[in-house]
């Protein structure tokens, strides 16, 4: 077995399959593109779904990749086991209807055992297979595997409900008896017992059948197109090749661990548990790559995952004795380890560090706040006579505030509390089950559409034409290819001026005419067929026949509106980079007829000043009437030109580069204006957050922009009339004057309210009642608003009238409740929570004063009557 670095292992895998005629697919972003079923890219095949379901046919049916992936359903196991990671790399080879079982097995055995490649000892490799899959067994024997090393496993069958399915075969490496102290041997593999001896390094899925849950598996029909999907974990391979005890004892993690040693003053040892070192090293990799790909910490979705990873890493840093912020300082090390294949971490190093540093600073403040929450919780439990900290409370502090369980338990035990360990485990298990349930299990192979996949005719889109003569080559109705269609159908022509929806640009609409110029069909939508042809969805008015020529004519006004928005999107993208920063990566776009929508990554709301500058800059470029040039070239030349690839686009060998003066240059397959002046005008109408770390700008161009400005002008004129400003230029001064007058009136009103409260107070406060050793006042009062209750409470505080004050008032349709306390035995916040339900309300506050709001005025008498009972 050869000695290799992780970079060499990755490259050798890719080189091997390249030598076998595979195209190397680049690693895609961890943030899925156009796939709502996935929170993260979680496997090597996840980015290739479109090929497996037949919606797109690849130029080469043989593919290979090294794909970064994230899985977070078992975060708690990271650091505890030898091989659990949140971010990992999957090496894979794939066949889309090309080779199958024979070649896949031969390739795997050659790569692993040949002296030209990894040169693993054959006697160290064991293979599992599906018992009924005798063909796979025979293929392994053919390539030279010892039959005693072939282990049948009933679970070796891949299927998720109805659809493509098939047996899989897994390759394991035997690390020897040193990792099998009980000498269990092959039983570990045969009975799927968790162990450190037999390490799975490669899984080959043979997508062969069309699963149908209503029939036995043995009767599943075969798929028309059989596929191969394999996955090899890079971290595991490197661990075996480099002789590491765990995946962390390799060149993928050890440089990070060495930096953690420097920061903590502690020493890492492969023979010790070292959980904190492992957690930090794993989590900083995930954070660096995910943030680099545009995901940002937040309170939901991907953002929540990143926030949780960061907080877990910080707490393990504290366990190692690291004081202050430290995580961001590890990012350059991550970048250097991975730079040979993933240069983006170093390229975005400053931005990644900025986000991590800011998030860590926020969490350190959260830790301080969490300490106060625990102190308050324990104090309340003591006042209620309880000596047990419930598991649900421990979990809430952990899950909501990121406060470490061990620290919560330690503080509670110091105060004499018993710990509900079982309750915490139940709450944690429930959360893990929710997390697993939230993961939509999407496999590599979706349903195959044979009809569309079978269309292989040549079809060309004519960028510059608005109308053209096209020959009807294929017509589809009710999912069948027919010679003549009427009603709703899908059509493919040899040439077409109709743009198929792609890259955020909506499809062209229009008409199809016959030789006499009569409209015979309306084009309602255009999409790409699996082999790339423009597939026209039409409603026919007269029958259309294959082989005949027709005039294809797009809706020119619709196209003109769409291209204005598309070109403006390029200008907006460039302006965002100039003003907000290069981290503002495109996260989606839509170029419609009426508007454009642009989603981008950014960690804060775009300020009004920034929006104004973006709008000004885009309009400046529009008015310069810059030429919009389109160049067709190869991908390498395009990148040398500095062209920026747009989010979610798949580019072939030849690409189109859209260049707008020296202001913008992007790879883009869409249609555009000829000059920027054709856009006319650009106006941002909305900026909003649509998810953790993702912002959205909606804008309009041309006539719609003029209408938006006109609407704003009309609104300003109406405001001028309302505030009696002679001219719109005087509206601001007039509104400011009115605000000053309002503030004066409010001060006078507050003063009158105070006097009113003082005049009422003698009557309200004279009815003092007793509950045990406490004196209290409980009264319904008439006040204009909640401030009236506070004014009365202020007067009560200045006098020695009672220990507790409870005031309730009906204000409009609502009920307001105030509780104040001078007694250390009564917490106002607790009492208000007990009383609020009488008026269908809720609230809270501090020990000395708390308030609540409700909606059930009929419950006021019952509330007042209950005060004595609650205080007794």
Swiss-Prot record:
EC number(s) stated in the UniProt entry for this protein: 6.1.1.7
Gene Ontology cellular component annotations, sorted alphabetically: cytosol
UniProt keyword annotations, A-Z: Aminoacyl-tRNA synthetase, ATP-binding, Cytoplasm, Ligase, Metal-binding, Nucleotide-binding, Protein biosynthesis, RNA-binding, tRNA-binding, Zinc
Recorded coiled-coil stretches: none
Annotated positions binding Zn(2+): 566, 570, 668, 672
One protein family per Pfam: tRNA-synt_2c
Top EC class for this record: ligase
Locations listed in the record: Cytoplasm
Reactions listed under catalytic activity: tRNA(Ala) + L-alanine + ATP = L-alanyl-tRNA(Ala) + AMP + diphosphate
GO molecular function, one term: catalytic activity, acting on a protein
Record-linked InterPro entries: aa-tRNA-synth_II, aa-tRNA-synth_II/BPL/LPL, Ala-tRNA-lgiase_IIc, Ala-tRNA-ligase_IIc_anticod-bd, Ala-tRNA-synth_IIc_core, Ala-tRNA-synth_IIc_N, Ala-tRNA_ligase, Ala_tRNA_ligase_euk/bac
One GO BP: alanyl-tRNA aminoacylation
Cofactor(s) this protein cannot do without: Zn(2+)
Family membership: Belongs to the class-II aminoacyl-tRNA synthetase family.
Written domain comment of the UniProt record: Consists of three domains; the N-terminal catalytic domain, the editing domain and the C-terminal C-Ala domain. The editing domain removes incorrectly charged amino acids, while the C-Ala domain, along with tRNA(Ala), serves as a bridge to cooperatively bring together the editing and aminoacylation centers thus stimulating deacylation of misacylated tRNAs.
Name of the protein this chain belongs to: Alanine--tRNA ligase
Lineage: Bacteria, Bacillati, Bacillota, Bacilli, Lactobacillales
Gene name of this polypeptide: alaS
């Amino acid at each position: 077995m050869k000695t290799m670095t992780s970079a060499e292992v990755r490259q050798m895998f890719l080189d091997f399959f390249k030598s076998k005629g595979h195209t190397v697919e680049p690693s895609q972003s961890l943030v899925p593109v156009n796939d709502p079923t996935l929170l993260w890219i979680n496997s090597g095949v996840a980015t290739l779904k479109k090929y497996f379901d037949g919606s797109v046919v690849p130029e080469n049916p043989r593919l290979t990749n090294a794909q970064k992936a994230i899985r977070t359903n078992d975060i708690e196991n990271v650091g505890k086991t030898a091989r659990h990671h949140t971010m990992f790399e999957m090496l894979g080879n794939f066949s889309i209807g090309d080779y199958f079982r024979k070649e896949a097995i031969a390739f795997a055995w050659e790569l692993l055992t040949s002296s030209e490649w990894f040169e693993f000892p054959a006697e160290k490799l064991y293979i599992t297979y599906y018992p009924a899959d005798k063909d796979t067994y025979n293929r392994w024997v053919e390539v030279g595997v010892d039959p005693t090393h072939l282990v049948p496993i009933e679970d070796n069958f891949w299927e998720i409900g109805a659809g493509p399915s098939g047996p899989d075969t897994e390759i394991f490496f035997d690390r020897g008896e040193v990792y099998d102290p009980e000498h269990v041997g092959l039983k570990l593999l045969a009975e799927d017992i968790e162990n450190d001896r037999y390490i799975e390094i490669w899984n080959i899925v043979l997508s062969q059948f069309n699963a149908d849950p209503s029939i036995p598996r043995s009767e599943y029909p075969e798929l028309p197109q059989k596929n191969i999907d394999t996955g090899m974990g890079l971290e595991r391979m490197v661990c075996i090749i480099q002789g590491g005890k765990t995946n962390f004892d390799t060149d993928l993690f050890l440089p990070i661990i060495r930096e953690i040693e420097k920061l903590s003053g502690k020493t890492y040892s492969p023979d010790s548990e070292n959980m904190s070192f492992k957690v930090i090293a794993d989590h900083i990799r995930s954070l660096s790559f995910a943030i680099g790909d545009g995901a940002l910490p937040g309170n939901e979705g991907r953002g929540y995952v990143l926030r949780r990873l960061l907080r877990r890493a910080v707490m393990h840093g504290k366990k190692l004795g690291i004081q202050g912020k430290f995580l961001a300082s590890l990012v350059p090390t991550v970048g250097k380890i991975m730079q040979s294949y993933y240069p983006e971490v170093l390229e975005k190093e400053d931005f990644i560090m900025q986000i991590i540093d800011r998030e860590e600073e926020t969490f350190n403040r959260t830790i301080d706040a969490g300490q106060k929450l625990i102190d308050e919780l324990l104090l309340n439990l003591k006042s209620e006579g309880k000596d047990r900290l419930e598991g649900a409370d421990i979990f809430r502090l952990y899950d909501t505030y990121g406060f470490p369980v061990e620290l919560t338990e330690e503080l509670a035990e110091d105060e004499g509390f018993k710990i509900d360990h079982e309750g915490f485990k139940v709450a944690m298990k429930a959360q893990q089950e929710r997390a697993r349930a939230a993961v939509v299990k999407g496999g590599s192979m979706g349903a195959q559409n044979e009809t569309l996949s079978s269309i292989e005719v040549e079809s060309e889109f004519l960028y510059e034409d608005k109308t053209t003569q096209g020959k009807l080559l294929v017509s589809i109705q009710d999912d069948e290819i027919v010679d003549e269609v009427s009603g709703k159908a899908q059509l493919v022509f040899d040439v077409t001026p109709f743009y198929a929806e792609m890259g955020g640009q909506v499809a062209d609409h229009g008409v199809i005419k016959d030789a006499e110029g009569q409209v015979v069909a309306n084009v309602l939508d255009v999409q790409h067929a699996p082999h790339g042809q423009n597939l026209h969805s039409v409603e026919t008015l007269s029958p259309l026949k294959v082989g005949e020529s027709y005039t294809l004519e797009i809706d020119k006004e619709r196209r003109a509106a769409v291209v204005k928005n598309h070109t403006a999107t390029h200008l907006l993208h460039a302006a965002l980079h100039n003003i907000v920063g290069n981290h503002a990566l495109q996260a989606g776009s839509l170029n419609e007829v009426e508007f454009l929508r642009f989603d981008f990554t950014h960690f804060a709301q775009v300020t009004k000043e920034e929006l104004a500058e973006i709008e000004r800059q885009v309009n400046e470029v529009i008015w310069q009437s810059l030429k919009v040039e389109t160049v067709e070239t190869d991908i390498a030349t395009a990148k040398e030109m500095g062209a920026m690839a747009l989010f979610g686009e798949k580019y072939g060998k030849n690409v189109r580069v859209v260049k707008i003066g020296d202001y913008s240059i992007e790879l883009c397959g869409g249609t555009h204006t000829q000059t920027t002046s054709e856009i006319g005008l650009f106006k941002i109408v909305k900026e909003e957050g649509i998810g953790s770390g993702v912002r959205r700008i909606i804008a309009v161009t041309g006539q719609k922009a003029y209408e938006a400005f006109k609407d704003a002008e009309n609104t300003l004129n109406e405001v001028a009339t309302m505030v009696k400003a002679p001219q719109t230029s005087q509206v601001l001064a007039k509104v400011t004057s009115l605000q000053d007058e309002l503030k004066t009136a409010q001060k006078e009103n507050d003063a009158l309210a105070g006097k009113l409260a003082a005049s009422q107070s003698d009557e309200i406060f004279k009815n003092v009642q007793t509950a045990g050793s406490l004196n209290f006042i409980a009264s319904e009062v008439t006040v204009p608003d909640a401030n009236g209750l506070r004014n009365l409470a202020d007067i009560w505080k200045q006098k020695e009238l009672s220990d507790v004050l409870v005031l309730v008032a009906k204000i409009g349709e609502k009920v307001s409740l105030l509780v104040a306390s001078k007694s250390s035995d009564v917490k106002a916040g607790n009492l208000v929570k007990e009383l609020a339900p009488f008026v269908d309300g809720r609230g809270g506050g501090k020990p000395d004063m708390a308030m609540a709001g409700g909606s059930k005025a009929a419950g006021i008498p019952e509330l007042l009557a209950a005060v004595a009972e609650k205080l007794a």
